[in-house]
């Protein structure tokens, strides 16, 4: 993998069974990141189980299992290259925890591929009130992902196959919805593909002569820009995992969101307030002297044991530590709730890699979702479709920052009853007092 090309974190989103895993698997295979032997083996295995059409999806699951078995400092991500960029696909999608992962994963993504099925009934299911196409688009927008490519998948399964009319119907419907969320739809390519046959992934499909836009890989190189690196901001690394590696020591793993981490730095982990010294940094098994925003790293710290820190903690420099919130004020949008949200309601807040319950202590104002203007002060309750300014008190210590200062740590989703209740951005934080304690 060349480290010379700009690096982009990509998330693949969309409704269950619309072909996300097949698309990623086929792409990896066609770009040469999986060998023929593995594909043949998977084909045999899939045939035996009568699941021939799942071979590329299986490929992804296989890669995932292999990776999960070997304990590596590396983050468990799938990588591939195009002519222009070096991509990491974060969280190759599964079913259950996907929205939860989408919330934590998307906050680290620079761009997204939305996969929608063109098959009759499937597209409609994804756009229904319970549909994940709709939910993932809303989440991606809140999580700050403006760079999007839409793959209109299963074009071989439309009626008739490769139907231009069906493609245009889907594009028109999606454009209208995405526009309402604030996406710049004229800057988003909609590519008719078949993840199963590989059409329009890399080469143009002869079956869709009516389409003259880019293939999926061309679109990745043309429409996506590498993120600008916020190197001048204070260091923030939300922790995803912590390993204790024999002969090495404690190794936290996470993505640098802002600032720069160097070997030899003293870092503090909040909320616990423990301090350690950085002995080494590694990315994709390569040692680094320093890590910058966008780098997914493992770093060995002296003076801290595995039990001192956990997923959801945030590392920063001792002189400008991450903010632990006593309470915070946020602008929220309610996506779904069976009845009404009142003061005292306690959803789980998913921000960066943390998930912590927080109680609503005050509903200050209801807003017009389109303009952000106050339409009612101190409303009694909020329901689906409402936007509001709300004050939260986390049940236990949690790092969260103002969106204006650290967008990556200032966005969140509210979850309850296995669903995303709402999304929000932090407008103000009342910091808690935390003692920073260096171990002798």
Swiss-Prot record:
Q: Where does GTP bind?
A: 14-21, 91-95, 153-156
State the residue spans of region: G3: 91-94
Q: What residues does Mg(2+) bind to? A: 21
Query: Is the keyword Cytoplasm assigned to this protein?
Result: yes
On the tree of life, the source organism's domain of life is Archaea
Family the UniProt entry places it in: Belongs to the TRAFAC class translation factor GTPase superfamily. Classic translation factor GTPase family. EF-Tu/EF-1A subfamily.
PANTHER family assigned: TRANSLATION FACTOR
The name under which this protein is listed is Elongation factor 1-alpha
């Amino acid at each position: 993998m060349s480290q010379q090309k700009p690096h982009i974190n990509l998330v693949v989103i969309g409704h269950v069974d619309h072909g996300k895993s097949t698309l990623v698997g086929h792409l990896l295979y066609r770009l040469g990141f999986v060998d023929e032997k593995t594909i043949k083996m998977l084909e045999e295995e899939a045939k035996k189980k009568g699941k021939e059409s799942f071979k590329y999806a299986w490929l992804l699951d296989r890669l995932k299992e292999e990776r999960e078995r070997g304990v590596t400092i590396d983050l468990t991500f799938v990588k591939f290259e195009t002519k222009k960029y070096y991509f990491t696909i974060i969280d190759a999608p599964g079913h259950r925890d996907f929205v939860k992962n989408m919330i934590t994963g998307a906050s680290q993504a620079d761009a997204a591929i939305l996969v929608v099925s063109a098959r009759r009934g499937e597209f409609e299911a994804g756009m229904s009130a319970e549909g994940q196409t709709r939910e993932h688009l809303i989440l991606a927008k809140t999580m700050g992902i403006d760079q999007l490519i839409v793959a209109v998948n299963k074009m071989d399964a439309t009626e008739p196959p490769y139907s231009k009319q069906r493609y245009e119907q889907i594009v028109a419907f999606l454009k209208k919805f995405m526009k309402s969320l604030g996406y710049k739809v004229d800057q988003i390519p909609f590519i008719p593909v078949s993840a199963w046959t590989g059409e329009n992934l890399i080469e143009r499909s002869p079956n869709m002569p009516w389409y003259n836009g880019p293939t999926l890989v061309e679109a990745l190189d043309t429409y996506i820009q590498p993120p600008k690196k916020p190197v001048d901001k204070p260091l923030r690394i939300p922790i995803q995992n912590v390993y204790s590696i024999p002969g090495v020591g404690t190794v936290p793993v996470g993505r640098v969101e802002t600032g720069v981490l160097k070997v030899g730095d003293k870092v503090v982990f909040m909320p616990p307030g423990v301090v350690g010294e950085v002995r080494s940094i590694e990315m994709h098994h390569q040692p680094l002297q320093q890590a910058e925003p966008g780098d997914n790293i493992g770093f060995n710290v002296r003076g801290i044991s595995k039990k001192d820190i956990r997923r959801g903690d945030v590392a920063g420099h001792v002189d400008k530590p991450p903010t632990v919130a006593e309470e915070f004020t946020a602008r929220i949008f309610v996506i779904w709730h069976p009845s009404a949200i009142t003061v005292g309601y306690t959803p789980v807040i998913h921000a960066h890699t943390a998930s912590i319950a927080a109680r609503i202590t005050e509903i200050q104002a209801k807003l017009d979702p389109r303009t952000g203007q106050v339409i009612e002060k101190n409303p009694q309750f909020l329901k689906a479709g409402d936007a509001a300014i709300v004050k939260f008190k986390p049940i236990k210590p949690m790092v969260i920052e103002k969106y204006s200062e650290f967008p990556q740590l200032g966005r969140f989703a509210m979850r309850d009853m296995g669903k995303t209740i709402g999304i929000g951005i932090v407008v103000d934080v009342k910091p808690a007092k935390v003692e920073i304690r260096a171990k002798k």
